[in-house]
Amino acid sequence: MPWSPGSSSAPSGDKDDIKSKLSSWTKPIRDHLSEGGNWIAPIIAAGATMGFWSFYKTYLRRIPNSAHVSPRYFHRRSLFGKVTSVGDGDGFHLYHTPGGRLAGWGWLRTVPKLKKELKGQTIPIRIAGVDAPEGGHFGRTAQPFAAEAQKFLDSHILNRRVRAYVWRRDQYDRIVATVYVRRPPFFQRKDVSMELLKQGFATTYEAKTGAEFGGPSKEIEYKVAEEVARQKGKGMWSLEKGGGFFHPSKKARAIESPMAYKRRVKLAEEPQRKLDS
């Protein structure tokens, strides 16, 4: 009767034959691995694979929305992408395009244009260090120059590629970031927060908690830019100066900062919130 090779009852001759065959099959492998130099290629290949995967996760993997922005990014990383919409004077949505043109964005890979394709695929960005006039949301009266601030930001960054240095996540799940854009004709890198302040379309952020400027030096630079715009009567600050000699009917008026406006509105709406609850 035939004997199973693994049977304990198999003839000793068959066992020896099996061992001999196994040894002959594995000997070339053992001989190959016994030479130290033969380990180099597999080790390099494994290291290269791990290195590429790490590089991909860190620099080339697209982040679809703010929920996927890890806290380890804060104060360490930046996000490069295209601005798909501007919501108000200090906020917009970013479609992350890691690697930029070198990674094929714009010629091999395209940014969606339809709203349904962009849904859940963009990161809401809150521009750091500044506060633009509040728009008329939820039936509230808009602040003066809210529309002008949004129009300026729209013309400055919409459909352009920007780099956002991320600092933290705010209470509305937006990513607070210092944003830079390059614009023609010389394509110098411009700090968007600074540009808003220079035009008088924002104040420096006033909240005692949660303020993010990207460093003490930035906060000082922003406050200086705000004061210069105020002295020149730029944007919202023109209301403080009135109409001057040529428009005497336009009286000078005090400016309510965006933060003061939000505090006033919150206080006025508090009784209604208590009734609703």
UniProtKB/Swiss-Prot annotation:
Active-site positions on this chain: R126, E134, R174
Keywords noted in UniProt: Calcium, Endonuclease, Hydrolase, Membrane, Metal-binding, Mitochondrion, Nuclease, Transmembrane, Transmembrane helix
InterPro entries given in the database record: SNase_OB-fold_sf, Staphylococal_nuclease_OB-fold
Enzyme Commission no: 3.1.-.-
Residues that coordinate or bind Ca(2+): D131
GO molecular function: endonuclease activity; metal ion binding
One term under GO cellular component: membrane
Membrane topology: Single-pass membrane protein
Enzyme superclass (EC): hydrolase
Keyword set includes Membrane: yes
Entry's localization field: Mitochondrion; Membrane
Main location: mitochondrion
TM ranges: 39-56
Span of domain TNase-like: 77-239
Entry similarity comment: Belongs to the LCL3 family.
Protein name: Probable endonuclease LCL3
Species: Podospora anserina (strain S / ATCC MYA-4624 / DSM 980 / FGSC 10383)
